[in-house]
Amino acid sequence: MSLCFSGCSITWGDELKNRYQERYSTIVSKHYDCRHFNLSQCGISNDSIVRTTINNLENLSAKPDVVVMQFTVHPRIEYFTDDDIIQNWTPQSVGKFDKCRNYYVSIYNEIIGNENMWKNIFLFDAYCKANNQKYVSFIADHFERIVVKPEKYYNNDEGYWKKMCRDYNPNFLQYHWLGTSQQCPENYAQGEKGGHPSAKGHKKMAEKVIELIDAI
């Protein structure tokens, strides 16, 4: 058996003291006594996660038995410069005079973010179905207002791509698996202040991912 993990800094293991040993991808792989590879990168968007994952799957000589896909904060985006260089934007890194600030202030709204996330979920699901690739997935977010009420941001009926994903039942990391940082501070690297999942949080994530894989 082989596993492929993809996502943002959560799957990468940010804020862990012993990242390679404590992150959930390692724990899950040890459970199945199998090899794995982790494609995750810090600060990337759902566009980047899906594109990077598909590119890697296309270039592998042997497909993994299961892909574990972690979708991320929906306001993150990527764009290409005139020189075909990929740039990633995150709301947290927007400077006072950055051009990306103009995008988030004048153009971006929650519907755009939701639509982009669901578009990527639809795209990856379609790719896996077309290529007989098994996968499990979950959605993670850093923003407390979304963590507490994800249905307000993710389960609305506005937009087109969400409706195309009517058969997709999302698993929310913080809401369904870890609890909020106020409810379960031990699951977070910064306790009640939140942050990335702690070592205990990654163990909890591993338990949930194992349940999803076993249910395939």
Which residue stretches match the model-derived regions?
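Alpha-helical cap/lid subdomain in secreted, periplasmic
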Residues: 54-216
